[in-house]
Design a protein with these regions (language model features):
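Negatively charged, low-complexity tracts enriched in Asp/Glu with abundant Ser/Thr
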Residues: 1-47, 63-96
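Amphipathic beta-strand/beta-sheet edge segments enriched in Tyr/Trp
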Residues: 50-58
Length: 96
């Protein structure tokens, strides 16, 4: 039962979360800003995992704010949606 749920959540990560993250990456690249966005993915023995790290830097290159959502197959779709929205709001805040 648990493995089935992990599999469904991993499919959601592939079909919904990753495309949204790629869309956010394109926006960061398209618009001049002090933002940095890193994304990594892995599958650890059948457990999917996506980590993202966004930060904004000041004129001296010092990090002034961060957002670090992690998407793990044990999270519900609702939890993952909340995290992607948090990242999206962070990016919008510093892209303006």
């Amino acid at each position: 039962m648990i493995q089935e749920e992990y599999k469904k959540n991993e499919e959601y990560m592939n079909s919904t979360i990753l495309p949204k993250l790629q869309e956010i990456q394109r926006e960061v690249l398209k618009n001049p800003s002090k933002l940095t966005l890193d994304i990594s993915v892995r599958n650890n023995d059948g457990e999917g995992y996506i980590s993202s790290f966004a930060c904004v830097r000041d004129f001296a290159g010092e990090i002034t704010d961060t957002c670090y959502p992690r998407f793990i197959c044990v999270y519900s779709k609702e939890e993952m949606d909340e995290l992607i929205n948090e990242l999206d709001e962070f990016i919008k805040k510093y892209s303006a």
